[in-house]
Regions:
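Transmembrane alpha-helices of multi-pass inner-membrane enzymes
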Residues: 50-56, 225, 368-376, 384-416
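Hydrophobic core of alpha-helical transmembrane segments in multi-pass integral membrane proteins
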Residues: 33-35, 49-59, 75-83, 107, ...
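Alpha-helical transmembrane segments of multi-pass inner-membrane proteins
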Residues: 3, 25, 29-32, 124-158, ...
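Membrane-embedded alpha-helical segments of multi-pass membrane proteins
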Residues: 41-59, 98-110, 171-180, 219-226, ...
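Long extracytoplasmic/lumenal interhelical loops at the membrane interface
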Residues: 151, 156, 278-335, 351-356
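Transmembrane signal-anchor hairpin modules in multi-pass inner-membrane enzymes, especially those
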Residues: 1-96, 114-128, 186-196, 357-362, ...
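A membrane-periplasm/extracellular boundary helix in multi-pass inner-membrane enzymes
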Residues: 229-280, 295-302
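Membrane-interface catalytic loops of GT-C/OST-like multi-pass glycosylation enzymes that act
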Residues: 92, 96, 166-169, 213-217, ...
């Protein structure tokens, strides 16, 4: 794929030499791969993004005025966290949590400014990197689950659930959704050769996601894929393209159904699937279950303007919040509790407004927005605060908003 025409709208990209552009794009590909390896601290993703920041700043990274609201909200969120953690910084885990939160905010701004220029090419490199990383993480989880790596079962699984290169099977499952959506788009839209390769990658990711036995990830993939397909049909430029998307999607659903039937014929997989698919899990029910804690925590949040500080919720309740919006109130008081959902839902509103903007990167935009929206919903039932891929998507969303400004202005002038 040639990217020469995609960088012309941005001054710094247009002025950069081919070698610089190639280096910048390669770093974004590497960031996508590194996002899938987070079972060690600091993770490769932190290292790659730090190197990328140095390279991009040295080669002309620009901060745009459109990012001012993003900067302000990220600052206020982390200011709230820091204020509420002031008396807890002697605890190493709290200090590490605060440092990670500030760094995640930095990566959002970094990704936003990077993808605001040379947008189509950089998004494509991130897409490719994420797919490679997802395949690696999935293969690791599959190998661990089926004891294919000597001594790797304990490292690559947790509670007989695949976790691959992640610490938690739930996070593995959540991470795989965006790369799976990218692969799905390729299967239904690209030429046969590329479509087949994407189908193989998708099958590997689907198996990895299944073996993670994450209910949220299963439901998330189904809902986000359905939402993305609807958007692809609505934004298609021809009837033939719409027909291909619909037919191929139906074939893909049939294939996944057959694969699921085959896998569930294995007793170990079937038993775990039935257990995880149940909606009457003990930790979800009761006064101090997942949803009971949400109600009690919300009552506490109204009475505590300065919260209780990061990682303190388990001192009051049997488990953590499992709700990122509640956790913002608990960890950062009213400042973070108000600013965090404000940032998330402002991004969602802007995301809907950009669905039908005709830009060269519309296809990846639909996948990223669908996956982001799914994670926003998942944040009501699980803590997503430090998921690298969540902040990666947030940064890409704002980068695409900024890059789309010339196109939205052009569309507005045509209407007038």
């Amino acid at each position: 794929m040639s990217y020469s025409a995609t960088a012309g709208h941005s001054l710094s990209s247009a002025n950069a030499g081919p070698g610089i552009l190639s280096l910048q794009r390669a770093l974004l590909w590497l960031a996508g791969v590194a996002c899938a390896i987070v079972f060690i601290e600091p993770s490769p993703y932190e290292i790659v993004t730090l190197i990328s920041a140095v390279v991009f700043i040295a080669t002309g990274l620009r901060f745009r005025l459109v990012f001012a609201p993003l900067l302000l909200l990220l600052f206020l969120i982390n200011l709230g966290y820091s204020i509420c953690a002031a008396d807890l910084m002697n605890q190493s885990e709290v200090a590490s949590w605060i440092a990670t939160s500030w760094y995640m905010a930095f990566t959002v701004l970094l990704l936003a400014t990077m993808t605001a220029e040379d947008t189509a090419a950089r998004l494509d490199m991130l897409r490719r990197g994420l797919i490679v990383g997802a395949v690696i993480a999935s293969l690791a989880g599959i190998a661990g689950y089926f004891h294919l790596v000597p001594g790797g079962h304990d490292l690559l699984t947790l509670y007989d659930r695949a976790r691959g290169t992640f610490k938690d099977p739930n996070v593995l499952g959540a991470f795989l959704i965006l790369p799976a959506l990218f692969a799905l788009q390729s299967v239904v839209s690209d030429r046969p050769g590329k479509s087949i390769r994407s189908a193989i990658a998708l099958a590997i990711m689907a198996l990895g996601l299944l073996l993670a036995f994450s209910r949220a990830a299963w439901g998330g993939l189904i809902l986000t894929a359905a939402f993305m397909f609807v958007l692809m049909v609505l934004t298609s430029e021809s009837r033939a393209q719409r027909s291909r998307i619909i037919v191929t999607a139906m074939v893909a659903v049939a294939f996944v159904a057959v694969l699921l039937v085959i896998l569930l014929s294995f007793d170990s997989i079937s038993d775990m699937f039935k257990q995880r698919a149940s909606f009457d899990q003990s930790y979800d029910e009761g006064r101090f279950g997942r949803f009971g804690r949400h109600m009690l925590g919300a009552q506490m949040a109204l009475d505590l303007p300065f919260g209780i500080g990061p990682l303190q919720f388990h001192r009051y309740f049997p488990e953590d919040t499992h709700n990122s919006y509640l956790n913002a109130f608990m960890s950062g008081g009213w400042i973070s509790g108000i600013c965090y959902p404000a940032l998330v839902f402002v991004t969602v509103i802007l995301g809907f407004r950009h669905i039908f903007v005709r830009v060269p990167w519309q296809r990846p935009y639909l996948a990223i927005f669908s996956a982001f929206l799914g994670t926003v919903g998942e944040s009501f039932i699980i803590d997503t605060d430090h998921w690298r891929h969540y902040w990666l998507m947030l940064g890409m969303m704002w980068g695409m908003f900024a890059a789309a400004q010339p196109y939205t202005r052009h569309a507005a002038s045509r209407r007038n």
